[in-house]
């Protein structure tokens, strides 16, 4: 599967000299690329998967100060609150307030002494939040409010009634995928080249050991040759993979990778967030996010496969135990899936995982005899811009560039103009308006450009996904402009298939759009479909038990066999051979279906209103 959309085509970068090559397409890599590109540097980003595929897309989705860091990492709290304020100014369309209720649980006991201890516990909690209030203005946060037991239960009747009272806390939620993507888009619009699904196969070195570039290979194009990219500075921002990447160049540094697991619910449990505590004292959150709710995160040292971290049933039970203590009715809600990330936490010996610093550092490997290579470690989503500024300033200094950083003031794509959701929706049928309002949240002022396609083809206003309202115009525009190469890439940019259906309703139609826009073959389309279904099951597996697990496994089999994906694989391969390499999986009314021929006795699956059809596409594939 080849690249498309300029910024993903490695042929445009082959043999080209850059000022800086950034390895890693997470929030740190995208932030560094944006900062360097806006200073006029020629930048290339190399990411072996998709943007935000790792920890950057697997966090709690908040740009917060981190109240728990007040006890042992005050500088991180202040820095995160400061950068949160900048992010709010440069990307207001991506943000939403999350009002938190922090319950103070009543300890076991009775008598006068216990009454005194209860009062001390309440007073101590309020003093703690008064300290956090000092930093709230930096991120436009509201000061805390102390609630009585009755006031807290009136706000959220689902709370455990065994509370002394509660304290409120104001935080900001964000779509982390969009934050990464919009940093990357801005970098591209300032001249950067972004190569997703490209893997570094080696470092290019001079006779003095200086790093002068990297060799990369396209992971999606069969038979792709290795391409050489050159630059005097290479930044290793590959997160938890960082030490492994540095070792390829003969350099080294240490991290303490931390595994974080979240549980996702497809519906809102409450409109408030809650601070919850694990049995071991770890603080987590139960909070509304987008159209659903999430609970997490765990924090455990991780020694496993960085490419395939998995949530376990024990981790799910640990999270639910903590949630149940504050919100006893949690078991009444159906869990949708889990997601997992591995943090590139700074290495420290003899500290519990949740006490590790969330500070960031970057290392110059010249002292190890590997000049030209800089490695980035640590950091938080809320402080990514500060990290990027520090690294980019060092890169610019080495290259003699004196242009100042502008990322704290320059708006991200979508924040440049007014957002007139009501105006955009007035000419659309009511059933499509929710999708447009959600589009405005993801794309801001640039939604207007996406909606121009609806003027030419009103059918593009139709929703392709009902769980997470997404219209066809957004899907096509995303493929054309946002470094999309695979079906799962669309998921990260639009949240399509992140809802309750997990892609069951929308994956086939979306894959057809990807085929049309990205010039896929039918076999590639089917590979994308199966990959999306596999990813869906991996996320759902840890939250399923007993009969639910058996039912889901049956659903997987029915989706693959009943939906004709198995026979369609064989049909597509044969038809592609007959049609010079091109065939398509089409969806439409049976009367509109293109002509087909039988392969293995099964060509298409018909329902009452639709048909899935494999058909050759005339002409050679470009």
Model-identified regions with their sequence ranges:
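Rossmann-like nucleotide/phosphate-binding core characteristic of flavoprotein oxidoreductases
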Residues: 153, 162, 394, 398, ...
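Beta1/beta-strand and adjacent pyrophosphate-binding region of the FAD-binding site
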Residues: 14-26
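C-terminal catalytic lobe of FAD-dependent flavoproteins
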Residues: 186, 247, 252-261, 265-270, ...
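Flavin (FAD/FMN) cofactor-binding and adjacent substrate-gating region
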Residues: 107-190, 195, 205-210, 215, ...
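Core beta-strand elements of the Rossmann-like FAD/NAD(P) dinucleotide-binding domain
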Residues: 16-18, 222-233
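Dinucleotide-binding Rossmann-like beta1-alpha1 core, especially the glycine-rich loop
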Residues: 61-155, 284, 422-434, 551-552
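Flavin (primarily FAD) binding-site architecture
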Residues: 236-250
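Glycine-rich FAD pyrophosphate-binding loop
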Residues: 37-57
